Curated annotation (Swiss-Prot):
Entry's transmembrane regions: none
InterPro entries, alphabetized: Ribosomal_Su5_D2-typ_SF (IPR020568), Ribosomal_uS9 (IPR000754), Ribosomal_uS9_bac/plastid (IPR023035), Ribosomal_uS9_CS (IPR020574), Ribsml_uS5_D2-typ_fold_subgr (IPR014721)
GO terms, molecular function: RNA binding; structural constituent of ribosome
Protein name as catalogued: Small ribosomal subunit protein uS9
Organism: Alkaliphilus oremlandii (strain OhILAs) (Clostridium oremlandii (strain OhILAs))
Entry GO terms, CC: cytosolic small ribosomal subunit
Amino acid sequence: MARVAYYGTGRRKQSIARVRLVPGEGNIKINNRDIEEYFKYETLKRDVRMPLTITDTLSRFDVIATVAGGGYTGQAGALRHGISRALTKSDEELRGTLKRAGFLTRDARMKERKKYGLKAARRSPQFSKR
């Protein structure tokens, strides 16, 4: 018998997360490591679990995810986005709850590029009067 799985892809900053939801007890594996081992900060762990918590599906699904690129914050955001998309595929009625929470919207904010003549994206060189 084939196992039921729901897939979702999430993106945030430079990070891309491929998420697979399978029926289970609520275990979250990221790049073959447990969530407690992968993320150091409790805020990031809470951020990843938020779509499951808000829809009361934390104990119904196991999350198996592959994340690449970016830093920890971007990866946590990408996971949240991917989990939300996979949850809508599992049950279309959850879409309204996730949409109201803003989890289905791709956060389009990216790092601003450095411009020539400046030290950073907006920081100008130090002004010298003489």
